[in-house]
Amino acid sequence: MLTDRELLILEEIVREYTENGQPIGSKTLMNNLPVKVSSATIRNDMAKLEEMGLIEKMHSSSGRIPSLMGYRYYVDHLLSPKKLNQSEAQQIQKGLGMHFREVDDIVRTSAEMLSNLTHYTALTLKPDQKDATLDGFRMVPLGGNQVMLILVSSNGDVTSQQFSIPRGMNSETVERVLRIMNDRLIGETLDQVYYHLKTDIPKIVEHYLHSNDGIIDIFENVVAQSSQDRYFIGGKLNILNFSKNVDVSSIRGLLTLFNENDQLDGLLGNNQSDLDVKIGDELSNALLKDFSLITATYDVGSRGKGLIAILGPTSMQYSKTLGLLDTFRDQLSNRMLEYYKHLDDS
């Protein structure tokens, strides 16, 4: 159990180190603390905090820095989110106030904005797609035997894939397949659409056309692409500014992390909390032992919940970053609801 003074000392060490990146000694603390106390008393309190594993000494300095356990204690017991300044609030309002044609554009822009505001790496995920239904497939001829297949879902998402018309088929045949798909699948959830494409639809298409060579696979691919989680990442290279690993394999591993959905699912997929902070070893990835991850959900009503996240150093400014995420997700929720209302009214 920490005394009030020890709590003040720990809080000040975290604040000073996360803002300035320098170890803190007893003299600095004596000048910064809101209570009057001698340097000797502060050293005794620091010794206790060090013994408890909440702060540690750096080899190059007589000052102390927070340990991973110290950051965890600070986040759990002492942290209060810092309110955004006027300039930051205006940046968010301006960025989210732009005209967006698709949901993906909003979520992609959000990742870029969060990265610019924090100088860390930002990740965003649009609301869960499991309840989205098929509004319809569209086909756009591109010339020659090239065609663009477009899937439009009920939540306003548009997914497209270019393909070559399979041998033995022509554009009229492909149009007939498209009509069969729309007649039978519009209004079904994307999971149900995928299931039908795997089971009864091939037989139906074959009954009408006496062949379904390759065409069903194309529809399956675009449905699978639409259904999967799609992460947007801002400031990928920012992560290298805070990595203590300088070998090529570690750097390659960090950058590869952002290109593999399975790894991102492992990093972000289990964060069901409204607001969550994972520090160092809690991320269960050896490459991220020097990093912290803050995640926050944003609510879009009946459209589901999305996710925003900040990946930065364990010495990140937690108070400022949490305050930013808390405000940003409220603004993002409002912007998404506004987008969907416009979509429903159109």
Curated annotation (Swiss-Prot):
InterPro entries: DeoR_HTH, GAF-like_dom_sf, HrcA, HrcA_C, WH-like_DNA-bd_sf, WH_DNA-bd_sf, WHTH_transcript_rep_HrcA_IDD. It holds the Pfam family HrcA. Coiled coil: none annotated. Keywords: Repressor, Stress response, Transcription, Transcription regulation. Belongs to the HrcA family. NCBIfam families: hrcA. Negative regulator of class I heat shock genes (grpE-dnaK-dnaJ and groELS operons). Prevents heat-shock induction of these operons. This is Heat-inducible transcription repressor HrcA. It comes from Pediococcus pentosaceus (strain ATCC 25745 / CCUG 21536 / LMG 10740 / 183-1w).
